[in-house]
Swiss-Prot record:
Protein purpose: Necessary for normal cell division and for the maintenance of normal septation.
Protein name, UniProt field: Probable GTP-binding protein EngB
Molecular functions (GO terms): GTP binding; metal ion binding
Required cofactor(s): Mg(2+)
PROSITE patterns noted in UniProt: G_ENGB
A Pfam family this chain is assigned to: MMR_HSR1
Organism: Glaesserella parasuis serovar 5 (strain SH0165) (Haemophilus parasuis)
Higher taxonomy: Bacteria, Pseudomonadati, Pseudomonadota, Gammaproteobacteria, Pasteurellales
BP GO annotations: division septum assembly
Keywords: Cell cycle, Cell division, GTP-binding, Magnesium, Metal-binding, Nucleotide-binding, Septation
């Protein structure tokens, strides 16, 4: 596998889609970012790309109802999936999102990895576990990012990471767990390295072709 190092600071907004049927052509490599509505998904993407407003952060959880696509380089896309599990969203909308997320993870051919973000103080809620299950059953590698890591002391942080690593063992898939803080820039390099390894396939194909 070719080793690559992409410049995530060059990432730019590509397009938005209301659901999987309106996504662009299923080609290249996509990596999805998923998480509960208040997990800090937009903040994490902005920290990775060093762009304050790339992914719009909202004080109202559940605001991101569209699938937003960002291009790192041609054929390398980051996909910001709608946040899930926010109480104020009508039940019907919630179920529709969940169906859409499940459909995307199971059917999108160019999807090569899933980053699932969880608040380090409230990890592994039911819907988080559902997402891990879907990803693992689709044979997709998963990076679990425990966000807002700056809210805990270093020892509490290590303890939570260890606890989550043990708790996910029954899923039996390729699941990695890391602490992440956009504020203190904890885990940003690890996220970039993992994304590089997932995107590397496209460059290997290019060289072989």
């Amino acid at each position: 596998m070719t080793e690559i190092k992409l410049n995530y600071h060059k990432t730019h907004f590509l397009t938005s889609a209301p659901d999987i049927r309106h996504l662009p052509e299923d080609s290249g490599v996509e990596i999805a970012f998923a998480g509960r509505s208040n997990a800090g998904k937009s903040t994490a993407l902005n920290a990775l790309t060093n762009q304050k407003n790339l992914a719009r952060t909202s004080k109202t959880p559940g605001r991101t109802q569209l699938i937003n696509l960002f291009e790192v380089e041609p054929n390398c896309k980051l996909v910001d999936l709608p946040g899930y599990g926010y109480a104020a969203v009508p039940e019907q909308v919630k179920l529709q999102w969940q169906r859409s997320l499940g459909e995307y993870l199971q059917k999108r051919e160019c999807l090569r990895g899933v980053v699932i973000l969880m608040d380090i103080r409230h990890p592994l809620k039911d819907l988080d576990q559902q997402m891990i299950e879907w990803a693992v059953s689709a044979e997709l590698p998963v990076l679990l990012l425990l966000t807002k890591a700056d809210k805990l002391s270093q020892s509490a942080r290590s303890k939570t990471v260890k606890m989550v690593r043990e708790a996910i063992l029954p899923f039996q898939g390729d699941v990695q767990v890391e602490a992440y803080s956009a504020l203190n820039r904890i885990g940003i390099d690890k996220l970039a390295t993992k994304l590089d390894s997932w995107f590397a396939e496209i460059f290997t194909q290019t060289q072989e072709g």
